[in-house]
């Protein structure tokens, strides 16, 4: 469903949800503007808010089982597309399993970033030196995820960290 929204609209609106309650609140938000109903088109489940809601730092500490349970809670109250923040995706074999599970649950897409090593959320600053995964390794991870899918609708979106890590636009385009 998210793919169709993107293809058919010039602008789509999403909001971060991190548990069933925030999903329920976001599901109910609707504004009537000049006779048109405005609401959120999709939900974003970020690792930052999911981790924070669990009292944990956003360093990929919250395991996939816990994050999948959060998705179950959100899916109980909505039929809106969900975009899942998969951080670095973990090791390739785990990422393949995660993608298959997300697709089976009905999640629309996941976003993986090209960082490697201990992940530190860049929203909290760049004082901790982060490194980018080698292009070939990152590309292979995405390819293995795509091969694991049973359909065409689920999307894997690459989040390239070149600009945040001061590597420049040329590096971002290359990646």
Q: What are these language model-derived features?
A:
Residues 1-175:
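Alpha/beta enzyme core
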